[in-house]
Amino acid sequence: MSRKIVLITGANRGLGRNAAVKLAAKGRDIIFTYRTHQHEAQDVIREIERAGGRAVALKLDVGDLSQFDCFISEVKNALQQHWQRETFDYLVNNAGQGHYKLFSETTEAEFDALMNVHFKGPYFLTQKLLPAIADGGRILNISSGLTRLTYPGSGTYASMKGAMEVLTRYQAKELGERRIRVNILAPGAIETDFGGGRVRDDKAVNDTIAAFTALGRVGLPDDIGDAVCAILSDETGWITAQRIEASGGQAL
């Protein structure tokens, strides 16, 4: 049986990197994107290969829709060259950027940048990739616990993620005839460099969040990588149109 192929955006660092390596260890091959830091992407390729997978890294800024047509061609070429296939199996819309600024202070330019990366970009990238996603495949969008929780300064970012949660349900309904399952994973606070590394590096922030989390700590990249693997496993094929939060019970 041929290995399943996963396309993950934004996997040269953080949660995407962790998920890519864990998926490779579970028998998946990986196409992943990076926006900058090509050396990090090469490191990820080596990690994936050590985990037993095959990997291809492609440069892409998800917030720049003018790059999409060229990117689609590169994906098709990679599929033919490395797997002799025309389709891949799973898409993970992971790429993103943090933003902490009050509603009253957020500029139109900042709003547009977040919209492009977190909603408009994934919307049209997924649309353009549909012919290359195998029937019976999966789409996993990445949201945030901030669509349920309310922290001043996170409203613009959370609004874009909320839009993705609504879109997920519609994608699941409309793509069901192709047996494509679509779900969305909402991580809670995680120790990564995302958003300047606040949760990881600021002990006061870390301790505060841990204090009102049921499991008594903030999340680690492994927690989310394991969740991605579970949602994309063969055993979860009857799950679609669901928001799945992985937060350790944050702010119950």
Task: Please give the residue ranges for each predicted region.
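Conserved glycine-rich cofactor-binding loop
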Residues: 12-13
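Conserved glycine-rich Rossmann-like NAD(P)H-binding loop of the short-chain dehydrogenase/reductase
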Residues: 28-43
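Substrate-binding pocket helix/loop in short-chain dehydrogenase/reductase
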Residues: 102-103, 107-115, 205, 209
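Active-site helix of classical SDR
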Residues: 126, 160, 168
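Short C-terminal tail/terminal secondary-structure segment
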Residues: 149, 229, 240-252
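Short, small/polar-rich loop/turn modules that mediate ligand/substrate recognition or access, typified
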Residues: 176, 181, 239-241
